Amino acid sequence: IQVAAQNCWVKKGGAFTGEVSAEMLANLGVPWVILGHSERRALLNETNEFVGDKVAYALSQGLKVIACVGETLEQREAGTTMEVVAAQTKAIADKISSWDNVVLAYEPVWAIGTGKVASPAQAQEVHAGLRKWFCDNVSAEVSASTRIIYGGSVSGSNCKELGGQTDVDGFLVGGASLKPEFIDIIKAAEVKKSA
């Protein structure tokens, strides 16, 4: 088990009250940071490009990154899910030279904290689409080796079916991580890892 911070700032130094620097996390021995979460994109207006800059800087400071991408309900209903997540992923790819220390987390915004969850088929479709995007735009090696995890109302009751999808490599768990059912989610991920 390793610890991840929920955010870090985009550059070194400066007076950015309330922000945590990548250097602080590295000095504390925190190996991971979550960047691009939909709440920060929506509430703090973090753009795709800004998230790309944050990912690049965190990596430059020796952190590993869980980079979040995902669409709103309106975007899903408009049929633009892949365009949206591809643009978010491209903004990261444009700023980094290696995906070795990046895990991509697909988190459909409409499924975060709402109790709604993408069906296993919907999750698989987007994860497979992201792998194809990597293959077409980065490399086949990155497509095969980059972990793509799912986040969005993951629970003890849906984790096995979601985790059973070919391209779902694990979970970014929110509220359920504070409940006893989190053990079921961990066990579902362990089964996938050992399979």
From Swiss-Prot:
InterPro entries noted in UniProt: Aldolase_TIM, TIM_sf, Triosephosphate_isomerase, Triosephosphate_isomerase_AS
CDD domains per UniProt: TIM
GO MF terms held by the record: triose-phosphate isomerase activity
Uppermost EC category: isomerase
GO cellular component: cytoplasm
Annotated active site: H37, E107
Reaction catalyzed: D-glyceraldehyde 3-phosphate = dihydroxyacetone phosphate
EC number annotated for this UniProt entry: 5.3.1.1
Pathway stated in the Swiss-Prot or TrEMBL entry: Carbohydrate biosynthesis; gluconeogenesis; Carbohydrate degradation; glycolysis; D-glyceraldehyde 3-phosphate from glycerone phosphate: step 1/1
Superkingdom per UniProt: Eukaryota
PROSITE patterns tied to this protein: TIM_1, TIM_2
Keyword Isomerase assigned: yes
GO biological process: gluconeogenesis; glycolytic process
Pfam families registered for this protein in UniProt: TIM (PF00121)
Record text on subunit structure and interactions: Homodimer.
General remark: In plants, there are two types of TPIS, cytosolic and plastid.
Name of this chain's protein: Triosephosphate isomerase, cytosolic
